[in-house]
Amino acid sequence: MALAATAVALLPLGYLLLRTAEGGLASWWETVATERVARLTATSLSLAVVVTVACLVIGVGSAWLVTRSNTPGRAPLAVLLALPLAVPSYVAAFTWVSVSDLWSGDPSARFEGFGAAALVLTLYTYPYVYLPVAAALARVDPSQEEVARSLGRGPWRTLLTVTLPQVRPAIAGGGLLAALYVLADFGAVSILRLDTFTRAIFTALSSGFNRSMALTLATVLVLLTLGILWGEGRTRRAGARFSTASVSRPATPLDLGPWRFVGTGALVVVVLTALGVPALSLARWMAAGSSAGQAWDRIGDAAWGSLSASLLGALLTVALALPVGLLAARHPGRLSALLERAAYLAHALPGVVVGLSLVFFGVTVALPLYQTTWLLALAYASLFLPLAVAAVASAAAQAPPSLEEAAQSLGSSPARVFTRVTLPLTLPGIGAGAALVFLTAMKELPATLLLRPTGMDTLATRLWSATGIGRYAEAAPYALLLVALAAVPTWVVVRRTGIVPAGSGAPRSDRSVPTATAPAPAEPVVSP
Amino acid sequence: MIRVTRLALVGALLPLTLAACGPTEEPAPASDGGTADTAESGAESDGTLTLYSGRNEELVQPVLDDFTSETGIEVEIRYADTAAMAAQLLEEGENSPADAFLAQDAGALGAVSAEGLLQDLPQETLDLVPDTYESADGTWVGLTGRSRVLAYNTQAVSEDELPASVQELTGPEWTGRVGVAPTNASFQSFVTAMRVLEGEDAAATWLADLAANDPQIREKNGEIVADVDSGAIDAGLVNHYYLYELAAEKGVAPEELDVALHFFPGGDTGALVNISGMGLVGEQADGDAQALVDYLLSEAGQTYFVEQTSEYPMIEGLEGPAGLPALKDLETPDIDLNDLEDLQTTISMITEAGLL
């Protein structure tokens, strides 16, 4: 099973090697060893580093604030903080440009370049860190922290030396996802005019239809990814930690005193800048244009297309991610690490390259599947497998293997141990992974355009079509519905993963009845 | 169902023969005088065809609907960027489900044709369109014409300030005022035309001077026209019809906008007329795709483009879009679109100049 998943992830890579091998090593080297490639490498890597660091700060900080502190308003904020993930980067970047144009009279001071790209990518990528870290923090057993506190460690030292190390797999996994997302992103960097690898790949394809140039550049992107994976692997070497209790109970929120309002303020600033700017722009588009009415006739079909394709993609991805994630968490070793890492390789490739590789796979190997929703779902699995693998692995790393061993020693079959012990314990992680894949698939564009069944629309393709000729008023309803639909699974997952106490609207009640609201992840949370 | 079975069979066999995939088979000899219905297999229409459209759905869906109600032939349509669509066609090769390719520019049709994926069109079809606007080997025809123009803000640029040539735009009086879209195929075709007409060195110099003149770079033509209208940019190099799309989106008459069009005079490269066009993909089992080409080049089809997308018609005897100079009155540069194939050199030159 794990091998099958790896094969899916490696499909685009195989295609890349096949295609670039046709040209030969000499011509590959000739394309790669240029000043431009060096510049692209520097830009792409710096952007990835800057955005990842910023994502870690915002993601870990906000996750800690909503799960472990008494910051007022943390229950609604916990949900809102995940929402920027629902905004496609191309929509985000475009709305930022159009809002900044309102203020800037000087066209040369346009909102573009490295800083702009770093800001926009951070604001819409940090949930890759926030979601898994918050889910992990909500599940981590607080007893070690309580011991540390009772032995006289201050709250900050406890946070740094006890709490954060326990969720380190989630932090590292989230950071890795953010870094790879930045490498693969096309929408934001192209609108904000920053020359990265992905933009160069698109340019090679779109101008001159130069596939060999595009694919050669993509192989360099794979090498960069390998470097990042290697670097991230080194930070993990200390090994996974397992919590000791089977079902965690919520930690007692830390009283921040007056600082709690600063915490709320910081979270509100993040949410407002990330969601407010697109909201403002979309409202302006709706008001200014005349084409909005045209969206309403077709929005239902497009929504159905988005939901069905993304749901199928999420199910397939999670099914493939489960064995890889469990293997990586339960049997750490060279092989499982290799399999897990392989899942990440396609994630840093731009959607158009993965799309083309599946076009090739479709017409040469799986023709009956070509231009069906199944092949599109396979593309989503190929692109987004790491989102689910990271979620499963970090959930499994926190579920103590001692429980499985106990079940086995009591005579349960491995299959029964899996369904009765392992699966329930990792379900919140699986749910979060499924939702991440679902959300990301909903906004995916280049591969969707290449692989969707002829005549099928999604909200993202309709959005693309409307903005393609400047019909922003028509685009606005699609963008709004895309975000609204994506908000539903986000909300469910935030509740189910225990970031916000389930069944309780009042965040403070968990202090008075700490055990009553303990999440009991016994029912499947595959995908809402 | 028949198609699915056939595709499944090919799918099963293809991995075996993949290595042998060499140059594609020559299409059947062009029928001289034979109509499309009798050409090839001569099969009856099955009432459906698959069209890959690199043109925007909002722009072409209505005329495709007209075609269906006129002929009863259903059109299965895939929409994507012209470039992505060309890449997809090239990747699909002979297994492509497409029957026809509708592209936004001649370059994409040329790239697909160069791989032998397009069929020869019958002479009657080619005869409808001026030689300048069709493929030299008869594998694609232009459906509409679009002219390069300078869109300018009527408040910021006076008429006597308008340049006689794109060459002037690199001068100090235009510093920081000109919008360009270097990633756009239409800009690249125009630069290719400059290379062909004025030589590599002249084109490289122009690009370097332009880049040094602090141009306003945008991703798309539409953004340039909108920014010229809003006054964020004074002028920009675009295709002529974006102004009409902006007017439609704002719900006003084109004259009410603050942006107007300047057609470069005297055969200047800046007045290049390019096309959107169509080619037939792969073996034609029946004449359905040909029927679509026929319809789009009929008076009804061409009138649609003139009135709804404000593009120039390709057939004789039709007036151009209202309010625009007639196609024959445009002082276009003397160039054959077939000479604009070498995009790679253009792209590396644009990249070298620092515009990409």
Each predicted region: which residue ranges?
Chain B
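A bilobed periplasmic-binding-protein/Venus flytrap-type ligand-binding module shared by bacterial periplasmic
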Residues: 149-156, 195, 273-287, 295, ...
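Early extracytoplasmic/lumenal segment of secretory-pathway proteins
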Residues: 22-23, 37, 42-110, 356
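An extracytoplasmic/periplasmic, membrane-proximal ligand-sensing/linker region
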Residues: 201-203, 311-356
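Extracytoplasmic ligand-binding site segments that recognize negatively charged/polar headgroups
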Residues: 54-61, 80-84, 96-233, 269
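Periplasmic-binding protein-like
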Residues: 146, 177-182, 207-211, 217-218, 255-282, 295-318
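C-terminal motif of bacterial Sec signal peptides marking the signal peptidase cleavage site
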Residues: 16-20
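A ligand-binding cleft/hinge motif common to bilobed small-molecule-binding domains
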Residues: 107-111, 235-258
